[in-house]
UniProtKB/Swiss-Prot annotation:
Disulfide bonds: none annotated. It comes from Neisseria gonorrhoeae (strain NCCP11945). S-adenosyl-L-methionine binds at residues 73, 104, 123-128. It comes from the Bacteria. It is found in: Cytoplasm. The gene is rlmH. It holds the Pfam family SPOUT_MTase. Its EC number is 2.1.1.177. InterPro entries: Alpha/beta_knot_MTases (IPR029028), RlmH-like (IPR003742), tRNA_m1G_MTases_N (IPR029026). It catalyses: pseudouridine(1915) in 23S rRNA + S-adenosyl-L-methionine = N(3)-methylpseudouridine(1915) in 23S rRNA + S-adenosyl-L-homocysteine + H(+). This is Ribosomal RNA large subunit methyltransferase H. GO terms for cellular component: cytoplasm.
Length: 156
């Protein structure tokens, strides 16, 4: 199973990179995990939020693996349990889907990009910093994969 996370933003704190790398390493042969950073559009000097999101959308669309099942993280998305996320991964794996999760920029994502997604998901009702979202998403994806492989990492 191939899992790609596209995250708008660069230059995360070291603890974010280290935590993501730790969970990514734990996937082992159970899933191929990749995090790709998308350059954020600079705001100000004549570039407003709408223009910035449009520029980021273009970069995101170029980075989505061809034919991938697109999941965008959005505050209005569904918040699955860890077991439900594992069931989604199981279904995508059985269908041979490459799954691509998108974490938008500071201003979010365009409506057009959200409409292209086959699923909208949220990690929490709280507003979270982007670095924390990277870590939480990667950990939850690892947890879901570990559930599918009956690994003792997840406990009910």
């Amino acid at each position: 199973m191939n899992i790609t996370v596209l995250a708008v933003g660069t230059k995360m704190p070291r603890w974010v990179d280290e935590a993501v790398a730790e969970y990514a390493k734990r996937f082992g042969r159970d899933a191929a995990y990749a995090l790709k950073e998308i350059k954020p559009e600079k705001r100000g000097a004549g570039v407003n939020a709408v223009q910035g999101m449009a520029a980021e959308e273009k970069r995101i669309l170029e980075a989505i693996p061809q034919g991938a099942f697109l999941v965008v993280l959005d505050e209005r998305g569904k918040a699955p349990t860890s077991v439900e996320l594992a069931e989604h991964l199981k279904s995508w794996r059985q269908n041979g889907e490459h799954v691509c999760f998108v974490i938008g920029g500071a201003d979010g994502m365009t409506d057009r990009l959200k409409q292209q997604a086959r699923m909208m998901m949220r990690l929490s009702s709280l507003t979270l910093p982007h670095g924390m979202v990277r870590v939480l998403l990667t950990e939850q994806l690892y947890r879901a994969v570990s559930i599918l492989h009956n690994h003792p990492y997840h406990r009910e």
